Amino acid sequence: RYAASVGSDIRIIGEPKTIDNDLVCTDHTLGFGSAARYVASTVREIILDANVYEKNSVTIVEIMGRHAGWLTGASALARRYDGDNPLLIY
């Protein structure tokens, strides 16, 4: 509206983005892919760090996502083979 009111020919397009991937009518949102890759990479590093200890342990990782679990689900990308960690994703 402002551009039109000052006589400018500029056209503006708005593109919603969220790393949570929780917008309706979209397959995926801008920002989700890089956030999912970051989560998977971080979880992989946590797994590698936890594997150096001789004692068995449980590691709990909290991942953001408001009311959507897409980023949490993306942590499964850290798996290298069936049965690899993360074992439980909630």
Question: At which residue positions do the language-model features occur?
Answer:
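Short hydrophobic alpha-helical runs that function as membrane-insertion/retention elements
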Residues: 11-13
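Accessory alpha-helical/coil subdomains and C-terminal extensions
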Residues: 1-9, 29-90
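Conserved phosphate-handling catalytic cores of large alpha/beta enzymes
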Residues: 25
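A broad, low-specificity signal for short, low-complexity segments enriched in glycine/proline
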Residues: 21-22, 78
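Short, ordered loop/turn segments at secondary-structure junctions
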Residues: 15-21
